[in-house]
Amino acid sequence: MATDWQPECLVTQNQTSLDPVGAHSDRALQNTTGNVQSYSDQLAHADITAREDQLHQLGFKYPHAPHHPQPLSAPGLHQQHVAARLHQRKLRRLHSVGPNSQSRRARSSYLKSQKYLEYRARPRRDTGKDGEPVWSDELEDAFQQALEANPPMGRRKWSERGKSYGRNELIAEYIFKLTGKRRTRKQVSSHLQVLDSFLKGDPDWERLVREASPERSSSVHGSAPAPKWRTAMEHPSASSHYGSHTHPSYHDHMRSMQPYAGDLPPPHYPLGSNMQEAAASAIHGFSFDMWVSAPQQANRLDKALHAYTRLQGDLHHPVAPPMPLEHVSGWRSSFPQLASMVDDINNPLDCDIILLEVNLELMTDFPPAGSRLGIQLDLDYGHPTAGDVLGVSQMDNWTCSTHIYEDSQKILETYHDLPKTQSTKVKPLFESSWWAKLFTQLTQEKRMAEDSGNPQAARDADDHARHFFRSLSAVQELRATPPSSRRLSTQYQGHHGDESKRMAILAWKFRQTRPGEVGTTTWRRLIPAPDRTTTNSPRPVSGVDRPPLSLDSILLNKPSHQGVYQTPQPHDLIHHPSQSHSQWPMYQSPHDNVANLFNTPGHLDFMTSISKAEDGLNDKTAVTSVLDSFSTSLAPESIPSTSLHGPSGAPVMLNVHDLPLSHPGMGYTMGHEASHYVPSQQHSVNMHDSNSVLHGFFGSNTQPLDDLSHGQASWGAHSTSIPGDVGAGSYQLPYQPEHHVPVSRESQQPHHFDGLLPSEDLMDKIVGRMSNGPSIHGAGPDASAGYDNATVDAV
């Protein structure tokens, strides 16, 4: 029977940091990159003693810098720390045996030339602004990598985001991405000249500093070849011999690890991006390990029975540069809790966001009874030189919330109070019990599938475990109360708000290693998008834009009484037939009746314009257009119908387009499917023609408006004459209040306009000025049709 984890034997995560293997365990995996395959294979078939011996051998095989006692003075401490770091970097460079380094070193034979070695052996006397040599060993290595990544481009430029960059600028940017240290374009150019002085003529050097076809470099405006490292970043699928140099530590030291389904794509960092976030970060060190200890062994990673994963790379330096959060594929679905924090505009993110990619190497069998699962998670807020800048040791009320998701669905949510730290290190909890149960369950499923004797069942169990880890993600949030918040809370006893400050967010992604791989964990910083409140956005519209006024509307505009409603100009309302049908906005019908359409109630003033200059096509429409465009269920306001009887032999020479009534001059149609404007005919205008004024009031159709509003027929043809004298017609319109109630069509009764017509003397003067010729409307003496008994509903 398979043994299970013993909960009482689980290693607490509040223990002190684990001691290294033979004082060198943190370097063992880094320096044994070439032995990853054999190391993992031997671990799978060796007992505990053999593993122990091998770890000690690895520690002696790749020794560290000697650990000198640190002096008490701060300057001496800093110098010793810097010297140790430089020595470690030299060892890493000497033991770098990754395929990319080998291929690069093999091609760059000049690096082994006597002149180059003598140059590098000289003491570095020139120092940069950061206090380090301008071209230290670290920067020199990054410089050589930048030469490979950025091919020669002559006088041409590489254009990106609207700016042009020369090769030296690209090299300087590349060096900054690898080392975090700035070197200017001039420093790169000077270094190239120095190296070219004694490496000129070497084929490998010439290949890196000069183009193959010199005649092409004379074209200033030609398109420069894309830097290989940028091409690889923009197109992860594109093959590039330098694609893996983006993260040299990760790829060089774990060459057996290949991209897998669910990996994050390589990021693309535009030039000029704010990569100084790492310098201003609060977290300066990170450590994470997960292992199994045998019952009789010490609770240490170097004595581990099995290591699920361990941190790969330097504890204080991520293996990859910071990456924008938006470049993480599917981060919103993988980290819902983080997405809610980013979207919270009231609480902008002001802490480090750490992305951890955990590769777990599962055990092939159950551990012995009494085995213990250990998880060590440390965050170091101490600055390498300044120390406890944030005052972490003075903070209280440390809390850690953990959200674990499977396929974006939350499967676990916990909250823990952390003990107050006495140093700059914080040790969050990472649910040891949950992980122990998970590993036991997965191991049990695998054993049952293997014991069944069905190879397909074993493969299915392995695929199930791999798919589970790919769909697994987690988000942790660390909060603490600064001393200033505690003082404020003490001063104001009534204040019960949340004074805690968000200190860090950890975003976890997981996968299961392939056979022969060692479980490792990498970490990098994520840069969230800028706060929405600090980014530029379009200014809101301060008001409604009104359409420009036509020239006729401006010329005909006159001061009028405040209570008079003025209709829009018809030539502003009429569309050309070729234009598409538009939906005209409906507006509240005016409460002015026909009697109030003129300036004075006593007589008609045909010489005064009743146009409203500020009304246009985009603001309001005539009442008739409202009836045409909408269903009859809308009850529009209307006025009583009128009748006109009387002969007239005068031609029509005037068209007044200041009234919103439906008539042939306006050119509307009344059918619901034909509810659009059509252009009216152009009429000869004579402002003293009273017959044309009356003709503008009333259409020539004999069909009632009630029938037209329900059918498809348009207005009838123009009538050619008006039988009878206009003056003989009798019109009456009863007085209507200013705010009248809409009346249905069935209840309307005919009325007359006698009270609205001018005096007979004025009418004689107007009629006397008319000519007897036929007009374009066919309303002259030769007209055949008339207006007898014609009834029109005025709307």
Swiss-Prot record:
GO terms for cellular component: nucleus; transcription regulator complex. Induction: Expression is also positively regulated by stuA. Residues 61-116, 210-255, 528-547, 769-795 are annotated as: Disordered. Residues 128-202 bind DNA. Its main location: nucleus. The keyword Transcription applies. Residues 84-95 have a biased composition (Basic residues). The keyword Hydrolase does not apply. Residues 237-247 have a biased composition (Polar residues). It holds the Pfam family TEA. It is found in: Nucleus. GO terms for molecular function: DNA-binding transcription factor activity, RNA polymerase II-specific; RNA polymerase II cis-regulatory region sequence-specific DNA binding. Keywords: Activator, Conidiation, Nucleus, Sporulation, Transcription, Transcription regulation. It comes from the Eukaryota. SMART domains: TEA (SM00426). One of its GO terms (biological process) is conidium formation. PANTHER family: PROTEIN SCALLOPED (PTHR11834:SF0), TRANSCRIPTIONAL ENHANCER FACTOR TEF RELATED (PTHR11834). BrlA, abaA and wetA are pivotal regulators of conidiophore development and conidium maturation. They act individually and together to regulate their own expression and that of numerous other sporulation-specific genes. Binds to the sequence 5'-CATTCY-3', where Y is a pyrimidine, making both major- and minor-groove contacts. Belongs to the TEC1 family. This is Conidiophore development regulator abaA. It comes from Penicillium rubens (strain ATCC 28089 / DSM 1075 / NRRL 1951 / Wisconsin 54-1255) (Penicillium chrysogenum). The gene is abaA.
